């Protein structure tokens, strides 16, 4: 069994497609078909078999999943998370991070005072957006770029932004 720290979320089943048990897979890899080059597992570390059928205009993959053969079976998979082993991923360049490593990181201001944490990382198609949860539990969305986040380490990020805190 694998710890979730050893797994990287790289896709999620969005919905079913058609009557033959096909699913729409939202891949978090770039390009989206790169997910098929990895050994895929579920949260427990059990292998997952996915076969590409086609790709839709949104870049989502239409696939067969394990031995699912009917629409009813496929409907039960909505939201199913797909992982790969961290050790199977390529080494990152300096200033590159996996989203899984940034989630919940401590956020410091320019004077190294803790002001909150990264609550979530979102992408609606125009780039990554960081959802910040401040110490007072309020949240704010900011673009993930060097202007707002000039320093990123494995333990914390520095926020260059005048907050209300």
From Swiss-Prot:
GO CC list: cytoplasm; ribosome
GO MF annotation terms: ribosome binding
Superkingdom of this protein's organism: Bacteria
A GO biological-process term: ribosomal small subunit biogenesis
Compartment list: Cytoplasm
SUPFAM superfamilies: PRC-barrel domain (SSF50346), Translation proteins (SSF50447)
Keyword annotations from UniProtKB, A to Z: Chaperone, Cytoplasm, Ribosome biogenesis, rRNA processing
Name of one Pfam family that matches: PRC
Signal peptide region: none
Record domain PRC barrel: where: 94-165
InterPro entries in the record: PRC-brl_dom, PRC_barrel-like_sf, RimM, RimM_N, RimM_N_sf, Transl_B-barrel_sf
Family (UniProt): Belongs to the RimM family.
Subunit structure: Binds ribosomal protein uS19.
Function in brief: An accessory protein needed during the final step in the assembly of 30S ribosomal subunit, possibly for assembly of the head region. Essential for efficient processing of 16S rRNA. May be needed both before and after RbfA during the maturation of 16S rRNA. It has affinity for free ribosomal 30S subunits but not for 70S ribosomes.
PANTHER family: RIBOSOME MATURATION FACTOR RIMM
Domain notes per entry: The PRC barrel domain binds ribosomal protein uS19.
Protein name: Ribosome maturation factor RimM
Protein species of origin: Rickettsia prowazekii (strain Madrid E)
